[in-house]
Every structure is written in C-alpha cells, then in structure tokens.
From Swiss-Prot:
Residues 1-21 form the signal peptide. InterPro entries: Diff-Dev_Assoc_Protein, DUF7107. Keywords: Glycoprotein, Secreted, Signal. GO terms for molecular function: co-receptor binding; receptor antagonist activity. This is Uncharacterized protein DDB_G0272530. GO terms for cellular component: extracellular space. Pfam families: DUF7107. The keyword Secreted applies. One of its GO terms (biological process) is negative regulation of canonical Wnt signaling pathway.
Length: 301
C-alpha cells in the first residue's frame, strides 16, 4: 500500500511540474512551420505568413515570404525589411536614399525630388534618421560620443549606454566596480549591477525555476522548453557567452568599414548578419522566444 501511495505521489508531482512548465510556455508557444495549417500569421514561425493558394482562413497554411517585386496584400507577406506598397513587395528606403515617387517606399519619410526626405526637414523620431544618427530637437544629428551628455540610450552609439546623463562604454566594468546600471558590467560573463551598487554575479542566471520569485528581484522565470524553465535577468536580458563582446565589436567595425547608413539586409548585407547573430547569441529574448528563434539563429550558421 505504501509503495502504491509513493508511486501516486511521484506521478502527481511529475504532472504538477509539467503543468508549471506548460503554464509558463503558454506565452511562448511553438509556431507552425511551412505548409502547416494556420488561421493567422501569428500562428506561424517568423517570418512566415498565413496564406497560400488556398487564401486565408479555411485550409490556409504557413507560407514563405514573397520576394521583392512580387504581388502582395499586406506587409507581413513580404520578406523582413520589405513592405507591401502599391500591391508589390518593395525594399524599404531610408532617409537620403534615392527613390522613385511612384515605385519606391520611403520608411518614415517621403520621396521628394528623387530622394527620401523629411518634409520640412524636421524629424519627429529616431527611425527617420540614418544609422548612427538620432533625432534631436527636430534634426537628425550624429550619436553622442563617449563622455558626452545624453538623456537615453538611443542618444549614444551601439557600444555605449546612457548612464547618469553620460554616454559610457557598455559591458566593461569588472566585478566589484561601482555601477549605476547593469549596462556597465560584464553582463556576458553573468554579471549585473547589484543592490549594493557594485557589479556582482547573478547567481540564478539560467538556473532552473518554477516561478519569478526563484530568480531574484530583477529576474524572471522563463520557458526555455516544455520541460525546462530558467531564470533570466530583466535589466539587460543578456546570456552568458564569452563571444558576445567580440561579436558586438565586429558589427560596429563592419558598419564603419562598409560605410553603411542603415542596418538592413539590403542596406548593409555584410554587417546585418553579424548583428542578427549577436542578437541571437547574446540575448535570451532572441534565443528563447520560439516564434523568432530560428530566424535569428539562421544568421549564425
């Protein structure tokens, strides 16, 4: 009788543990692949869309994106960084790019006299400006240099963060160094800016968990798979990977070397894959979120 009770208890605990994993995974479900059934594009793995020869709804399947120049009905049917414009998939153009008023699509700008421009030369958002520029007081200006004043991270270069009103180098301070933000610490070694104001080891990183309270005050318990939930840090969202600093440096150097003004597959084909591999290798959102993880991973092969 005791043996039966023990077996029942083991089965019960197993079911509870599995259900905990499934509960966390409800917000991170597996997605349908090419030719698998779907109702909406959100059912499909990114960047696939729901729709095929059968159309949407009944009998629809997840389909590969339509290439540049192909007929389309919506943006999500086109390849990433393209847009459906005048029923055709078009490459997004950015500020300063040459354009055709009837055939081109200028992202966050308009085609004026053959060039993507901001009407009145007044910007309202950073995405209207070229790479390494941001919108400040209505003008697109170069990003602030290290040590310069700033009010947010987007005012600084990719290798800098805005901390205490100054652009400072990211991810370099060693254990025990005084910090105001985890962006200053060696996050790819598993460090964060602790409650004591010093760079400290985040001991729970990627340890197994059942709920957020298992992961510390700035951590979250996240579904990695149906059988495994792990702790991640919310302040930066970094993974422990010694290759990440060199990936970031390689991307930054590539953009300078190639003189790219936009970080897109067409605007900077040599550098964009480095950036996407960096995103997958170094941040849990891009490695664990199952709707997009394979897309990001494809750039690391």
């Amino acid at each position: 009788m005791k043996i039966k009770l023990i077996l029942v208890l083991i089965v019960f605990l197993t079911i509870v543990n599995v259900n905990n994993s499934i509960d966390l995974c409800l917000s991170n479900p597996k997605k349908a692949l090419v030719n698998q059934a779907c109702k909406y594009s959100t059912d499909c793995e990114y960047p696939l869309f729901c729709g095929s020869g059968n159309g949407y709804g009944k009998n629809a399947t997840c389909s590969k994106n339509i290439e540049t120049g192909g007929s389309c009905e919506s943006n999500n049917q086109c390849t990433p960084c393209n847009v459906c414009f005048n029923a055709k998939c078009k490459v997004k153009l950015y500020l300063g790019d040459a354009c055709d008023e009837n055939k081109s699509y200028c992202s966050s700008s308009v085609c004026i006299k053959g060039k993507c421009s901001i009407q009145g030369d007044v910007c309202t958002a950073n995405n209207q400006c070229k790479f390494n520029n941001y919108c400040k007081s209505g003008k697109c200006v170069p990003l602030e240099k290290e040590g310069s004043s700033c009010d947010k991270d987007s005012s600084c270069s990719l290798t800098n963060a805005c901390v205490g009103g100054k652009c400072v180098t990211k991810y370099q301070k060693p254990l025990g160094a005084v910090c105001n933000s985890s962006n200053e610490c060696q996050v790819f070694s598993g460090h964060v800016c602790g409650a004591n104001g010093k760079c400290s080891v985040y001991n729970q990183l990627l340890s197994k968990c059942k709920e957020n309270s298992d992961c510390g005050p700035n951590g979250m318990c996240m579904c990695k798979s149906e059988t495994e939930n792990v702790c991640v840090d919310l302040s930066v969202g970094a993974l422990k990977n010694d290759k990440c600093p060199s990936l970031l440096s390689s991307f930054s150097s590539c953009m300078t070397r190639e003189r790219c003004t936009e970080n897109t597959p067409t605007g900077c084909p040599k550098c964009y894959p480095i950036f996407m591999c960096y995103q997958y290798s170094c941040f849990y959102m891009n490695q664990f979120i199952r709707s997009t993880q394979n897309y990001y991973k494809s750039f690391c092969s």
